């Protein structure tokens, strides 16, 4: 079996050299899915996984725009249309200086499985640019978004490819992108998700990823006879996902001890309650300030510059910042402090060695493709509402989100049960694979 996996990875690596993030994502899937494929005659010999790792289409383009100093700036834009076997391409747009082909291909590949797990008819895709919205004025961001969409619009559509937000792309950017698409196409369609409520958006969509992480993690804990009530919770990040995860953790009776950004993390021993979280939302969403500004209002808290929050003793850890933020040494700290569960809010935030450390020590571990699927799930619900020309209530959407996250958890149990342990990585990968693989077989070699 190891030989088959190594041969497969060698072939994929040959075609995707110098793409470490993409190869990391492919390796994780291959190690759990290939043993399953070998046992199933219907899949064996069809090269389905090899077809999955090859994007159906890679789009790269120049994005030229003019800053406030009337200087011309040039960025690079991408859209990876990875797999459309079960529906139109669906996945976010990321605006960040680190964006490159490897990162977007890893995200698009993960998106195939994540979207499949929701059971909604959505294929996998991802896109973005190396543009950095931090420090830019609203006018500069608008000019960039308009230039970006002027090329992207010809590749997307409500039945072809439906982008959404990601790191660096929030409601402001989605608004500018949608406005330019509408201007170019002269039509009002659900071509983007994450829209404002007054112009085609869905209630709960901004909160969905963060809420979903906690709903999924709660299901894991309940399966072990546990829950968030009375638990100390460490969260990384302070963006949309982290904020919304902290909100639900608090409602469920947990105590949120930390939040972070790229400058470091804050530790509030007494807990970041709803009032304190509201202040953080003001700092990050409106003032776009660094997390350490929190201490001006709450001086009893501590700020640790250029450090990660995993050194704080906790019961539950929710990495909600970015890929590979939780390394092997961080995992060792969680093990040392008797952490019982790690639920991923970000995409691939844990390194392979960290995942191994956690699972070897029987710590419940929820891979992002399962635990953070809430965002794309409600994106799918937003698409449905756009098609119906009808809006569901907040309670209706939240109930549907809880149901979807519960179904994803059950799928992970169905495919990931081992002796006295649930391998959620294996369960999520195989459950996501089966639906897409069956569709690909039915549609022939295309």
Describe each PLM feature range.
Residues 264-365, 370:
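Rossmann-like adenosine-cofactor binding region
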């Amino acid at each position: 079996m190891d030989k088959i996996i190594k041969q497969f990875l060698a072939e994929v690596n040959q075609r995707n050299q110098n793409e470490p993030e993409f190869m990391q994502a492919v390796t994780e899937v291959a190690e759990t899915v290939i043993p399953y494929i070998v046992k199933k005659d219907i899949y064996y010999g069809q090269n389905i996984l090899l077809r999955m790792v090859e994007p159906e289409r890679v789009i790269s383009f120049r994005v030229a725009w003019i800053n406030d100093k009337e200087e011309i700036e040039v960025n690079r834009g991408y859209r990876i249309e990875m797999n459309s076997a079960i529906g139109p391409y669906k996945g976010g747009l990321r605006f960040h200086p680190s964006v490159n082909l490897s990162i977007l291909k890893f995200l698009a590949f993960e998106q195939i499985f994540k979207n499949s797990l929701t059971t909604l008819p959505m294929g996998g895709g991802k896109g973005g640019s190396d543009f950095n919205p931090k420090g830019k004025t609203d006018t500069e961001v608008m000019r960039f978004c308009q230039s970006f969409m002027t090329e992207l619009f010809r590749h997307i559509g409500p039945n072809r490819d439906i982008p959404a937000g990601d790191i660096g792309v929030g409601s402001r950017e989605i608004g500018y992108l949608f406005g330019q698409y509408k201007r170019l196409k002269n039509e009002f369609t659900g071509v983007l998700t994450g829209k404002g409520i007054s112009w085609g958006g869905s209630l709960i969509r901004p909160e969905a990823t963060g809420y979903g992480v906690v709903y999924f993690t709660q299901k894991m804990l309940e399966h072990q006879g546990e829950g968030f009530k009375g638990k100390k919770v460490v969260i990384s990040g302070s963006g949309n996902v982290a904020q919304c995860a902290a909100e639900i953790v608090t409602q469920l009776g947990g105590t949120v001890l930390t939040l972070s950004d790229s400058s470091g993390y804050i530790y509030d021993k007494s807990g970041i309650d709803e009032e304190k979280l509201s202040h953080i939302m003001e700092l990050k969403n409106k003032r776009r300030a660094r997390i350490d500004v929190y201490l001006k209002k709450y001086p009893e808290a501590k700020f640790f510059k250029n450090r990660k929050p995993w050194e704080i003793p906790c019961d539950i850890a929710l990495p909600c910042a970015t890929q590979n933020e939780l390394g092997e040494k961080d995992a060792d700290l969680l093990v040392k402090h008797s952490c019982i569960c790690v639920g991923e809010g970000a995409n691939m935030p844990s390194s392979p060695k960290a995942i191994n450390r956690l699972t070897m020590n029987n710590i419940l571990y929820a891979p992002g493709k399962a635990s953070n699927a809430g965002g794309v799930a409600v994106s799918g619900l937003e698409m449905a509402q756009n098609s119906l020309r009808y809006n569901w209530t907040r309670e209706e959407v939240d109930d549907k989100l809880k149901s979807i996250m519960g179904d994803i958890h059950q799928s992970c149990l169905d495919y990931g049960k081992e002796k006295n342990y649930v391998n959620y990585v294996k369960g999520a990968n195989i459950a996501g694979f089966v639906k897409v693989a069956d569709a690909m077989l039915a549609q022939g070699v295309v």
